[in-house]
Swiss-Prot record:
Organism field: Cavia porcellus
Gene that encodes it: VIP
Residues recorded with modification Isoleucine amide: I27
Gene Ontology CC terms: extracellular region; neuron projection
Chain positions with Asparagine amide modification: N72
A biological-process GO annotation: regulation of protein localization
InterPro entries: Glucagon_GIP_secretin_VIP (IPR000532), VIP/GHRH-like (IPR046963)
Principal place of residence: secreted
Protein name: VIP peptides
Keywords recorded for this protein, A-Z: Amidation, Cleavage on pair of basic residues, Hormone, Secreted
Length: 72
């Protein structure tokens, strides 16, 4: 009887540990995916800001060049 109780309790404990590991892996995977998505969104946002700033700079340079050619 004692062996059966021990085996049953031990099996339950292993099941709980497996479930805990599985949940922790899901949580870590979800956190990593959220961090990757946030990093990708931040990278895309940074790229867009760079492109916007670069486009403005090019327009300003073109305007200066045009004004220089008209005024001189």
């Amino acid at each position: 009887h004692a062996d059966g109780v021990f085996t049953s309790d031990y099996s339950r404990l292993l099941g709980q540990l497996s479930a805990r590991k599985y949940l922790e892996s899901l949580i870590x995977x979800x956190x990593x995916x959220x961090x990757x998505x946030x990093x990708x969104x931040x990278x895309x946002h940074s790229d867009a800001l760079f492109t916007d700033t670069y486009t403005r700079l090019r327009k300003q340079m073109a305007m200066k060049k045009y004004l220089n050619s008209v005024l001189n």
